[in-house]
Amino acid sequence: MAFFLLLIVSLLTCIGQVCQKQAVVSWQNNSTTKARKTIFWLITAIAMLGFGMLFWLRLLQILPLSIAYPMLSINFIVVTLIGQFIYKETVNVKHWVGIASIMLGIVLMSMQS
């Protein structure tokens, strides 16, 4: 149950972040529907982050904060991949070393002691 909730929280918060990025992209566009598109993406971002918070509150009833919060570091990995492959952002070697360090930390924290 905890893993499922963590997955939902992570997905919703990542989607919320991507919607915020899309709002910025829409705002920079010079189309006549710029404001409407931007508002759509901002409202969608707020909704995704709000639903993510509700699932997060449920997750905190199951897992200690000291375990649950670091597990959300997976979001750094997901958002970096989305930035690179969807928005064609450049990710340098230092960034990938940081991502690998985060992944190692997640693995270490998820291991039973």
Curated annotation (Swiss-Prot):
Function: Translocates 4-amino-4-deoxy-L-arabinose-phosphoundecaprenol (alpha-L-Ara4N-phosphoundecaprenol) from the cytoplasmic to the periplasmic side of the inner membrane.
GO cellular component: plasma membrane
Transmembrane parts of this sequence: 39-59, 62-82, 91-111
Family, as annotated: Belongs to the ArnE family.
Alphabetical UniProt keywords: Cell inner membrane, Cell membrane, Lipid A biosynthesis, Lipid biosynthesis, Lipid metabolism, Lipopolysaccharide biosynthesis, Membrane, Transmembrane, Transmembrane helix, Transport
The protein's assembly and partners: Heterodimer of ArnE and ArnF.
Protein name: Probable 4-amino-4-deoxy-L-arabinose-phosphoundecaprenol flippase subunit ArnE
Pathway: Bacterial outer membrane biogenesis; lipopolysaccharide biosynthesis
Source species of the chain: Proteus mirabilis (strain HI4320)
Gene from which this protein is expressed: arnE
